[in-house]
Amino acid sequence: MRFMGKNKFHTGPGPSQRQLRVGETIRRALSDVLARGDVHDTDLNRLSVTVGEVRASPDLKIATAYVLPLGGQGKDEVIALLARNKGELRRLVAKKLTLKFAPDLRFQLDETFDRMDETREMLNRAEVKRDTGPVPAGESDTE
């Protein structure tokens, strides 16, 4: 007996190909809506918002958008404005999707750039540079 909801092709811990594809489609649609200013909220339309990633839940009912205001200023304000307008955003994004149900949109701050800065700082430390630098001639780890 087969269960209809089971994904027989995906058994790993990460997202399935469908989740990735739907997330990317939602990201593009949401970016277009925000860039064109289609939302009827002047506060939201005056801000430039970057949608870095959208992760869809396995059942595609929830989509979490990771956003960041251009310049990184007013992060909390952007999340509040997006949450306030999520119904209209959901409707506008759903027009561009070919899914049976429009996913519920949730918004979180995209911290990718902060993590990249931390990684860059770590790689610039003297002890890390020493460990990751070129191996002097005549020395190797395989001896």
From Swiss-Prot:
Primary localisation category: cytoplasm
One term under GO cellular component: cytosol
Protein location: Cytoplasm
Entry's family note: Belongs to the RbfA family.
Database matches in InterPro entries: KH_dom-like_a/b, RbfA, RbfA_dom_sf, Ribosome-bd_factorA_CS
Higher taxonomy: Bacteria, Pseudomonadati, Pseudomonadota, Alphaproteobacteria, Rhodobacterales
Known partners and oligomeric status: Monomer. Binds 30S ribosomal subunits, but not 50S ribosomal subunits or 70S ribosomes.
Protein name listed in UniProt: Ribosome-binding factor A
Keyword annotations of the record: Cytoplasm, Ribosome biogenesis
